[in-house]
Amino acid sequence: MMRNIITPAVLSTMIPQEFEDWRDGGEVLRRELTHAAMRDLTCPAGWDMNGEYRSEFGGFFPVQIRFTPSRGNFSLAVCSPGDISPSWMVVFIPVSGRPFSVIRTLPAWSSEVITHTLSLVAHLDADGYSQASIISVLAMEGAA
């Protein structure tokens, strides 16, 4: 059986419908796609990284990876293009689930930019910034 290999280069060239096709291919293909993105990202120290394989996080995106600090007071969701959005998004989600904020959009996969965003949020959180302040800093950086 021939297998498709999803590399960072492949992730950066996929169009939204291809992500949806992988999701429609079932849990095994969706897991492969999610793990390809997870392998290319650096999780901040002391944070958890969890991928969606069924509909654990609502099932809105073909790839959704949640990064959560140990206190668990918010998560960052890395969401792939698909039917909902043509772009990669990083979404700030408070523990209550709302209001959420899209803090970064990317026309193509860029693990460097996403990892930078994760790292910046981790540092701001560790330094005691409020959630509103973290979102404001990202907006000033041009991320939001």
PLM regions and their residue ranges:
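Intrinsically disordered, low-complexity regulatory segments enriched in Ser/Thr/Pro
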Residues: P62, T68-S119
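Acidic, proline/glycine-rich low-complexity IDRs
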Residues: T115-A144
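Structural alpha-beta junctions
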Residues: D40-D48, S85, G97-P99, A126
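Intrinsically disordered, low-complexity regions of eukaryotic proteins
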Residues: N50, R54, S85, D127-Y129, ...
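Negatively charged, low-complexity tracts enriched in Asp/Glu with abundant Ser/Thr
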Residues: M2-S70, I134-M140
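Intrinsic low-complexity, intrinsically disordered segments enriched in polar/basic residues
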Residues: M1-M2, S80, V90, A143-A144
